[in-house]
Amino acid sequence: MVRKLIFLTAFSLLLTYGVEAAGKGFAIVVDQSTYTACKAEIDAYSTLLEREGFSPSLLSGEWKQPDELRQQLHHLYLHHQLEGAILIGQIPVPMIRDAQHLTSAFKMDQERFPKRDSSVPSDRFYDDFDLRFDDLGSDEEEPLLHYYSLRGDSPQYIQSDIYSGRLKPTRQGEEGYQQIRSYFRKLLLEREQQNPLDVVVAYTGEGSFSNSLTAWRNQGMMMREQIPAAFRNKSSAKFLFFNMYPYMKELVTEQLRRMDLDLMLFHEHGTPDRQYLTALPHTKESEEQMEAGRRLFRQALRRAGDVQQQEKLKQTWMELYRIDTLWFAGADDPKQRVADSLLDLQTGIVLDDVPLISPNARMVIFDACYNGDFREERYIAGEYIFADGKTLATFANSVNVLQDKSSTDLLGLLGLGFRIGEWAREINILESHIIGDPTFRFAGDVADQVDLRTTDTAYWLALYNKADHPDLKGLALHKLSDLGYPGMAEFLTKAYNESPYYSVRLQAFLLLQLYGGDHFAQLLEKSINDPYEFIRRKSVYAMGAIGSDHFIPYLVKIYLDNYLDERVHFNVTFTFDRMDFDAMEAEMKRQLDQNISYPDKEKVWEEFQHIFASRKRIAAMANDVTNREKPLKSRISAARMLRNNNYHKQV
């Protein structure tokens, strides 16, 4: 098999193709300097792909803007069966603007905030060829960053044509080249192993899912359906919760270092440089509680800066909390500052921790904000793959991400031998990215029996009916939906009503939202009581998004009866202002009067009124959109608020 070689420069374009080879196309994209420094390792990777049935193309050059590269990838897709690409080294970073509706949560004012901060680093620019953009130019200080605006005549949804992965080093110069060389060496060693996906660890950090134990417990039930091989003994599937121990960092580190660990899944808050595992430990000891309070005061005083501001804060706190100056002692003491800093480091994993941990999980999923922000020189997801352990790929987000987003959709495909990229292509959002080799896969022979390229709806219908694994059924539902199978809304409704699997019902639920008619609204009356907490959570959210007063009795009942499902209960409060205020209040009073579970109904009513009043104040802001007496700035702000708040009556 002859490898295809493509050299690109800013001034010339030279395409040199070898004899056309059968098989799936794959593009190895690398800047010229990196290829020169890492040629042996990159060529060895290409040879590995050839052995696995790919027809790899090497694209090496010095790109000034992403458009040149996108055109070449599109050409390979149209004419050479391109399936995926890996972007190695200093490859231009598309910074997408005017596409926040394609993100799960990112909503930042593009006029008020700097362009760099209010754009989304996204390789959907490279792997979804139907999206259309206007070129806004490169960043003046960081020319690797290139800004694009999503056009109004572009598709307003994501449906990636190929899959992609990034291999951007977290060090500069020779150190960065060494990272890439070392990565490919360990990748080649691991790819020689036939390693099944049968050891999984999931960690839920403080603040995730409103600290709901129900949500935490249900993820184990879901993953047992998806990855049954991991549930063979007490150590092969572990689900850790932030309050199992005062500081969980050491326990998490131990799990990451396990030589047999295949998949690590983090549900946590994050930044480019940190994973937040825990906050202040919960304790019943009064002295520990007081010390935690003193530490918070010290941290706030240090952030305040000048002495005058510190004294002002102290006076405010002493009057408000009736405390003395002893609560602030040590704020300026260097030894106390170091002690507080060391304690703070116990609450999370920072950039410099990762090389010391040397994580061995072959794949790590970060269900977190910003851990995959590859516009930064160093970022958590990158540090994981370049550490000395066995981690080969991470799946992470380049900006903030919605907590109420399913992070394990179709995850069972990985255990069946599908490549990480094949899985990610089905579930991509604007901010999600593979960091590392997208062709990596765990051992399994089912994937080779599934033709992902076919557009024959009869094939996918047969797969849905015959498949034993629930995520194969879920994949079939996705393909049938993408291909426009007639009567899909009815088919999805039937799939939800008949399937015993959490994962199949979830995919049917999520896909049914894309169709008009009454099918989805009618399904919500049943799905709001689904055994799977995440479906209940999303059902509540969907009722609020639809905004029909018909749902008021259902939402009130959930609010009063499901207070132990913290995240579901939390989502209900965000629906109070989406429907008729008087009807919502009257129904709450009616059901509360009939409720026999609450010993103090007056307190429950007061809590509802407090939340209800707050939501009504927020809803009132939406009226500014049409109020010509308001300043233009206020009206624009109100219009932006509608992106996350579906106020149908005001619109």
Where are these regions (language model features)?
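Bacterial N-terminal signal peptides
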Residues: 6-16
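Short inter-helical turns and helix N-cap capping residues of alpha-solenoid HEAT/ARM repeat scaffolds
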Residues: 468-469, 500-501, 531-532, 563-565, ...
